[in-house]
Structures are given as structure tokens and as C-alpha cells.
Amino acid sequence: FIVSLSTVILPELSTDAKSGNWENFNKNLVFGIKVTAMISIPATVFTLLMRNEIVALLFKFGKFDDESVRLTSYALMFHISGLFFIAVTRILFPAFFAQEDTVSPTIAGIVSVIVNIVAAYLLVGSMKGGGIAFASTISAFVSTVILVFMLRRGGKINMKAVLTSFLYALKFLLISICCGVQLYFTKDFVYGA
């Protein structure tokens, strides 16, 4: 879904950047971040809580036994935690491309890859497959921070609005956690045998 959103938002951002309509550019960028939060954060919380059931439903057959479900669920837990950051980078990249800036996303991408490799190397020993997944989450977070910081450089982006959209994401996180608490205490009743 987020890839579709970023595909749709790029022409809008490009048109706004070329015409110098930075107010509309900011509005579209903030809208993209908010929609990303609205979709990815509840999906993250739900997947965190239902990861064992999801993995078992999709993969548990043949040689993929309970231990395989446990190991895959463990890695999924760390990987899905970075969904919002992965999704936000897919929205932030077009913001740079629309301004004909390919250097900033490239720098963020290179740093992100380096962070991913180093974190995976450091975490794989103690966390096994979960460490590799967590390294991806860490690198997505670092990439998001770098991209947001680099947005400030041009002076055309309303950083207050962008940062406020991240507060909007925090609100969605709190709401999702409240819903998640209910799911946590009722999932055995609802989904149990």
C-alpha cells in the first residue's frame, strides 16, 4: 500500500516543487506521513500481538513445525517493529526526488546500509535471526532520522508540520496500544480452540 501511495504522491510533490507551491507541497508530504502512520502503526501492533498465529496460519505444514513457527515469529517481531520507519522512508524519498535532489536519499541509503550491516553483525550472535531483523529496523529508523534532518536544509519544508505529523503517529501508536491491550487479553478467547 505504501509503495502505491508513494507512487501517487511523487507527481503531486513534483508539480508543487516545480511551480514553487511549497504550501501545497508541505500539505501533501504531511498527508502522506499521516496516512502512512494510520495504516502501518495499527498493522504493526496487530502483527506483534498475533505474530505466532499469523506465521502458523501461513507456513505451518510439512517440515515447518512449532519450532520453525517460534523462530520465524521471533524474527517477525523485530522486523515488523520497523514497519512505520520503512514506510515513512518511502514517502520521504519522493519529497527529495520532487525537488530534483537525488544526493540526500543516496547518502541516507548508504548510511542505512552501513548501519544495517554493522548492527546485523553485532546482534546476530546474541539474537540470531531476530538480530538480523532488528538490524533492519534500526537502519530504517536511522534512515528516517537522516531524511527528516536533510529536509531542513532547503528551508522550503515546513519542519514544524512534518514533526507534528510524527506526533500524529505517536497518537496512533497510543490508540493502537490501547486496542492491542484488549486484543492481548481476549485473543485466546476469540482465537483459541
Regions found by a protein language model. Give the residues of each.
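Membrane-embedded alpha-helical bundles of multi-pass transporters/translocases
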Residues: 1-193
